[in-house]
Amino acid sequence: MAKLTVKDVDLKGKKVLVRVDFNVPLKDGVITNDNRITAALPTIKYIIEQGGRAILFSHLGRVKEEADKEGKSLAPVAADLAAKLGQDVVFPGVTRGSKLEEAINALEDGQVLLVENTRFEDVDGKKESKNDEELGKYWASLGDGIFVNDAFGTAHRAHASNVGISANVEKAVAGFLLENEIAYIQEAVETPERPFVAILGGSKVSDKIGVIENLLEKADKVLIGGGMTYTFYKAQGIEIGNSLVEEDKLDVAKDLLEKSNGKLILPVDSKEANAFAGYTEVRDTEGEAVSEGFLGLDIGPKSIAEFDQALTGAKTVVWNGPMGVFENPDFQAGTIDVMDAIVKQPGVKSIIGGGDSAAAAINLGRADKFSWISTGGGASMELLEGKVLPGLAALTEK
């Protein structure tokens, strides 16, 4: 990566501004998945071990009006982070003003402070999300000229807390998480060890058009699963019953198939049910066609066998999107078996592109078997699409 990293700057005695991604799920004020906090620890620990004073910024959820602030404070995150670090985390509970400034100025070397949810600034004119110039300058003024971006999950957005701060400091550098995310995903797509197989699932073709187009150029094979299968089926005149379909994307699906040169591999059967919820019958289809009154909710056993074969010998695999409704045990076989087929390949570099695929790997107990699981769904999708991420572009060149 041709950008400066946290190891390229002297941190001792400096107030170091750090954008992390602590956008974690909360239920009744309790964190239900702390992966993003854990992922930020190496960078935070490095800064404080080097004698820096870490000032952390993160958003949590969406905040558009005053009422949205309810349940969106980062207070539970501050407590969780303190427990993980084994030291106090200063939490003034505000995003600006004298209370925040005094707390920052009172920090000593090796201490950590967490600023309140950056999106609280969106209540009055979307200042965070619209990269308000004044807000970026103000937050930048709280530090000593060093900004560390370690929030891959928001790297595809130009916000005040990443791009805005970057524009107003002497050095904007990458943290370890951001550096690893870019290295794994970009290298997999741009300079893969071959054979390189991409697996794309999920419900909508529209979400993945750019990704499919880019990967058809870069990968040796692109396997398609999930709900978007049925848009590809219908584009070829195959019966899909009541399955999910994007009628306005049939021409796009047809076009992708025509220009794929045989690289695009679709399922050959499905697991179908007579309803999405409250179904009374689940069965495997004979072939591609879904029965009238039924809908496809997972890839079938023949498809699993074909995908297993397509993955044999793969040295690089990028997976984004489940094969079916994996949250339901009746429709998780495709996702489980494809995961197992990926990780059993000898010497494979296996990467999950965040989002539902990451949740599937974690929930189904396969997370530790992958080389890398991305912390950013949208950001990883844009990297897979070959786009430049604003949060990365704003960092200082080496």
Swiss-Prot record:
<feature type="binding site">
    <location>
        <position position="208"/>
    </location>
    <ligand>
        <name>ATP</name>
    </ligand>
</feature>
<feature type="binding site">
    <location>
        <position position="119"/>
    </location>
    <ligand>
        <name>substrate</name>
    </ligand>
</feature>
<dbReference type="Pfam" id="PF00162">
    <property type="entry name" value="PGK"/>
</dbReference>
<dbReference type="GO" id="GO:0043531">
    <property type="term" value="F:ADP binding"/>
</dbReference>
<protein>
    <recommendedName>
        <fullName>Phosphoglycerate kinase</fullName>
        <ecNumber>2.7.2.3</ecNumber>
    </recommendedName>
</protein>
<dbReference type="InterPro" id="IPR015911">
    <property type="entry name" value="Phosphoglycerate_kinase_CS"/>
</dbReference>
<keyword id="KW-0808">Transferase</keyword>
<feature type="binding site">
    <location>
        <position position="327"/>
    </location>
    <ligand>
        <name>ATP</name>
    </ligand>
</feature>
<keyword id="KW-0324">Glycolysis</keyword>
<feature type="binding site">
    <location>
        <begin position="354"/>
        <end position="357"/>
    </location>
    <ligand>
        <name>ATP</name>
    </ligand>
</feature>
<dbReference type="GO" id="GO:0006096">
    <property type="term" value="P:glycolytic process"/>
</dbReference>
<feature type="binding site">
    <location>
        <begin position="21"/>
        <end position="23"/>
    </location>
    <ligand>
        <name>substrate</name>
    </ligand>
</feature>
<dbReference type="GO" id="GO:0006094">
    <property type="term" value="P:gluconeogenesis"/>
</dbReference>
<dbReference type="GO" id="GO:0005524">
    <property type="term" value="F:ATP binding"/>
</dbReference>
<comment type="pathway">
    <text>Carbohydrate degradation; glycolysis; pyruvate from D-glyceraldehyde 3-phosphate: step 2/5.</text>
</comment>
<feature type="binding site">
    <location>
        <position position="36"/>
    </location>
    <ligand>
        <name>substrate</name>
    </ligand>
</feature>
<feature type="binding site">
    <location>
        <position position="157"/>
    </location>
    <ligand>
        <name>substrate</name>
    </ligand>
</feature>
<keyword id="KW-0547">Nucleotide-binding</keyword>
<feature type="binding site">
    <location>
        <position position="296"/>
    </location>
    <ligand>
        <name>ATP</name>
    </ligand>
</feature>
<feature type="binding site">
    <location>
        <begin position="59"/>
        <end position="62"/>
    </location>
    <ligand>
        <name>substrate</name>
    </ligand>
</feature>
<keyword id="KW-0963">Cytoplasm</keyword>
<dbReference type="GO" id="GO:0004618">
    <property type="term" value="F:phosphoglycerate kinase activity"/>
</dbReference>
<keyword id="KW-0418">Kinase</keyword>
<comment type="similarity">
    <text>Belongs to the phosphoglycerate kinase family.</text>
</comment>
<dbReference type="InterPro" id="IPR015824">
    <property type="entry name" value="Phosphoglycerate_kinase_N"/>
</dbReference>
<keyword id="KW-0067">ATP-binding</keyword>
<dbReference type="InterPro" id="IPR036043">
    <property type="entry name" value="Phosphoglycerate_kinase_sf"/>
</dbReference>
<comment type="subunit">
    <text>Monomer.</text>
</comment>
<dbReference type="GO" id="GO:0005829">
    <property type="term" value="C:cytosol"/>
</dbReference>
<dbReference type="InterPro" id="IPR001576">
    <property type="entry name" value="Phosphoglycerate_kinase"/>
</dbReference>
